[in-house]
Amino acid sequence: MASIRQAFVKSLRFYDIGYNATDPVFRGIYHEKLKHPDDFDSIISRAKAVGVEKMMITGDNVENSEEALNLATNYECFTSTVGVHPCQAQCFLRHSEGPEDYLVKLEALANKGKASGKVVAFGEFGLDYDRLHYAPADVQKMYFEEQLKVAVRVQLPLFLHSRNAENDFFAILEKYLPELPKKGVVHSFTGSIDEMRRCIEHGLYVGVNGCSLKTEENLEVVRAIPLEKMLLETDAPWCEVRPSHAGHQFLKTKLPFDSCKKERFKEGCMIRGRNEPCNTYIVAEIVAALKDISLEELSEQIWENSINLLSK
């Protein structure tokens, strides 16, 4: 792998700010069934081979955030987040000891993780009005605001989720941003140019992954994001760049790894349909083409952005 890195990426370095590393598919488990051997460490090796030096593991509830922190503690290349995803907002109401106790546990975990140096952002949290069947809007809004209060007390930058909820999202968020010097990032951004500019005006970074590169309209938004306010991510195992995506036409490089179906697993192969952090390189190559700059220039600026937001 070291020789691949030397030949393939030279001086490039990337920080995948959205890796759902606690998902069982990274252990070979799909829909609760083991389909192939655990290849977790191979995924990390592939990422490092193409210059992905850091990966932030995202948490989406208390239990999952604790698992993310445990992983981050055991791997130097990992950092993590603590938070409750809007689609899991019902966790607060379903908790056997009540929502207040769930918030207490969330804050304690965030403080513990921050003290260890491994938890570098609060989230993933926000609003998702595309999937109200998981949690109604009133519950999402209530616990978006309650979590913002926790984030202010803990003083962590925000790792935010916003889907089809722009006005409510900013109405709640802007009450707390003045108390958060580093602000945060709206990850997996798929909104309009106007919404993107609203993020920038609020001091937020914008996270770009394969889902940000699906349509021509998406590409116009990515072109318009100021480079100094952009971060890159995969949101693996989801949001891979597919041949049907508008951004796919800008790809020039094939990563130096074989791929296989999960049912025909081979050691060292990427699993088809399972996104992973090494594909940060793919996202970066498309964005560099859209921006008409070199991959080296893009890599260095995005790395600087990532460190500015996610380090002490």
Curated annotation (Swiss-Prot):
Keywords: Cytoplasm, Hydrolase, Metal-binding, Nuclease, Nucleus. One of its GO terms (molecular function) is metal ion binding. It is an enzyme of class 3 (hydrolase). Its EC number is 3.1.21.-. The keyword Metal-binding applies. Its main location: cytoplasm. A divalent metal cation 1 binds at E124, D235. Its cofactor is a divalent metal cation. It holds the Pfam family TatD_DNase. Belongs to the metallo-dependent hydrolases superfamily. TatD-type hydrolase family. This is Deoxyribonuclease Tat-D. It comes from Schizosaccharomyces pombe (strain 972 / ATCC 24843) (Fission yeast).
